UniProtKB/Swiss-Prot annotation:
Cellular component terms (Gene Ontology): cytoplasm
CDD domains: UlaG-like_MBL-fold
NCBIfam families recorded: PRK11709.1
Subcellular location: Cytoplasm
Catalysis performed (reactions): L-ascorbate 6-phosphate + H2O = 3-dehydro-L-gulonate 6-phosphate
Entry similarity comment: Belongs to the UlaG family.
Enzyme class, broadest EC rank: hydrolase
Lineage: superkingdom: Bacteria
Name this protein carries in UniProt: Probable L-ascorbate-6-phosphate lactonase UlaG
Length: 354
């Protein structure tokens, strides 16, 4: 059988997916976090891998799914939160635009799995399966009640799950995880298809979503999940020291308010008294495409007049950010390589070839 005859769609997928293979898994495992710092990697959407100076590994909102893949059904699912929000009928054209940079089934060293809320792009059955199958049998799954309900429904033992609500603190080795109030109004209208939201007092946010503050020996990270802007960010900023804050950013389609705008991101950062603000979530959905440079431009316009005490940082999926080493950087660039150029003699026809 010739080579072209032996290749199938399945063999093509297995040979190319996930696109980064285990490259990032290996990078994270090999990273030695220096004292007085913490390192984190962007996994796409709001997925974050955090590693402390003590070698503690936690992942938050790591999602390995995809968006729309076919024009087959032109209508939105009945009762979808966006349908409730805007009274739409047409299919939402939300295609995943970000590659898969971390292989969940190559994860071996992990100390906790967390989710901020139960939306499909923030909690993942594949991650749960991979951790259950390949990692230590005491790795906890931490999240609000709706997330724990999902994990247990997928087969994660109830005793492995920790339900958190605002005010709760969970210690995972040298990382202290504080569950804080979330402000994700979209989560409140994510309901069963046959349940009406109109005229009904919504279920409390605390069972559906939380924000997290990760206090590490080397600094503190605030993860806002899918939260919208809220004045309550200022309360969180008053009560906690926050070094780096992550906020869900995107260009909201007409009739929709689901992501923070550039102005919201700056207000969030100012309210939290953070030193660095990093937008995320704008990478993942084609119909919420947004340019994070807008945040930096607006920051430049306002920073002197409003005496901002923070800087924005524009990240790339799969990239690493180390606090405080990267606190004065504005943008991430993937490693460019070739730092060892001319360590051996080039093999060229003549010196002026290049």
């Amino acid at each position: 059988m010739s080579k072209v005859q032996s290749i199938t769609r399945e063999s093509w997928i297995l040979s190319t997916f996930p696109e980064w293979g285990s490259w990032l898994n290996e990078e994270i495992e090999q990273e030695q976090v220096a004292p007085g710092t913490f390192a984190m990697w962007w996994l796409g959407c709001t997925g974050i891998w955090l590693k402390s100076e003590g070698g503690t590994n936690v992942c938050v909102d790591f999602w390995c799914g995809t968006g729309k893949q076919s024009h087959g059904n032109p209508l939105m699912k009945t009762g979808h939160q966006m349908q409730r929000m805007a009274g739409v009928k047409k299919l939402q054209p939300n295609l995943r635009t970000t590659p898969f940079v971390l292989d969940p089934f190559a994860i071996r060293q992990i100390d906790a799995v967390l989710a901020t809320h139960d939306h499909n792009d923030h909690i993942d059955v594949n991650v749960a399966a991979a951790v259950m199958q390949n990692c230590a049998d005491d790795v906890p799954f931490i999240g609000p009640q709706t997330c724990v309900d999902l994990w247990v429904g997928w087969g994660v033992p109830k005793e492995r799950c920790i339900v958190v609500k605002p005010g709760d603190v969970v210690k995972v080795k040298d990382i202290e995880i504080h569950a804080l109030d979330a402000f994700d109004r979209t989560a409140l209208i994510t309901l069963p298809a046959d349940q009406k939201a109109a005229g009904v007092l919504p279920e409390g946010m605390d069972v559906r979503a939380v924000n997290y503050l990760f206090k590490t020996p080397g600094g503190n990270l605030y993860h806002s999940g899918d939260s919208h802007y809220s004045n309550y960010y200022a309360k969180h900023g008053n009560e906690h020291q926050i070094d780096v804050a992550l906020g869900s950013y995107g260009e909201n389609p007409r009739g929709i308010t689901d992501k923070m705008t550039s102005a919201d991101i700056l207000r969030m950062a100012e309210s939290l008294n953070t030193k660095v603000v990093i937008p995320f979530h704008h990478d993942i959905w084609s119909n919420f495409q947004a340019d994070p440079q807008e945040i930096r431009v607006l920051w430049e316009m306002k920073k002197d007049r409003l005496k901002y005490g923070f800087k924005p940082f524009i990240w790339q999926v799969g990239g690493k950010f180390t606090w405080p080493l990267d606190k004065d950087n504005f943008e991430y660039h993937y490693p460019r390589g070739f730092d060892d150029c001319f360590t051996i003699e080039p093999d060229l026809p003549f010196k002026s070839f290049l």
